[in-house]
Amino acid sequence: MDIPFILGAYASHPTPELEADYYQLLADQPWVSGVEIPYPGQLVTQADVLAAHLAPHWDFNTITAIPGTMQHVWKDATFGLASPDEEGRQAALAFTRALCDDLDDLCDKAGRLLVGRVQLHSAPTRLADAEAFKRSLEEVVGWDWSGATLVVEHCDKYIPEQKPEKGFLSLESEIDIVAEVGIGIHLNWGRSAVEGRDAETAYQHVLEAGVRGVLDGVVFSGAGPEETQYGYAWIDGHLPAQADEPTSLMDAEQIGRCAQAALAGGAEYLGAKVCVPKDASLAKRLAMLEGIYRACHLQG
């Protein structure tokens, strides 16, 4: 099936001196349609380098605002597009405007439109308010996004008795909001699994967004109940698939059923984003990502 497949390559970056070789290796793979770009990251600090890494035939790159969003939330608990605190919401709108402007600059440097989707989030932790988020999205959706479409990436919802990784709005609330605003939902398998503490939650989230007609994309990152080299139990840390990390709940069967459910639910793209052992070769990094792609059963 001809559907874009993106890679969160930044999670599996090698050392800086091997970065260009890694991107070239990814560009040589016919099944790779683009990469997920973390914001701010290289988009702010090394836009020229980033533009050079993006292969000319990659026509479906994405940007995620989650790194910068969380950096702000850790400093200011009221920061977020869903903040009930107006100063916190305005600060998040200013951050989002900067992202929009930096995307425009990146496209100028590359001489073409580069990005298909921009992922926004319903921060802040614990305090997120649905009406505030809706107001923010209604404003930003009208901006010029250099050819990109906005999506809301669901992260684990706030559950009082559970230590949050992100602790944002529920998927149900986000679905209602994006349906009104006219944009879609982006799911990350691991973030949904972290919320429910099981693999089934990820599958149910795919079904829920699909049934409501707002599922836009699904990216596969793992999660699990044990401490690993990638972090503590239930970290939102992009664990590899079970074939490469035995404690990960994301096995080939889970990937396959969620990918097929996503396609049936109208998803426009799929992807993979996993961390890797620090000493992994470039070939091993690629193999870990390609294993997820193969498990989606998109070929033929």
Task: Annotate each PLM feature.
Residues 1-98, 188, 299:
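N-terminal pre-domain/capping segments
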Residues 2-11, 32-36, 60-62, 115-119, ...:
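Structural preference for beta-strand elements that scaffold enzyme active sites
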Residues 20-31, 44-68, 101-113, 140-146, ...:
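Acidic (Asp/Glu)-rich catalytic clusters
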Residues 77-182, 284-296:
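Active-site acidic/histidine proton-transfer and metal-coordination neighborhood
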Residues 140-232:
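Acidic/histidine-rich catalytic cores of soluble enzymes
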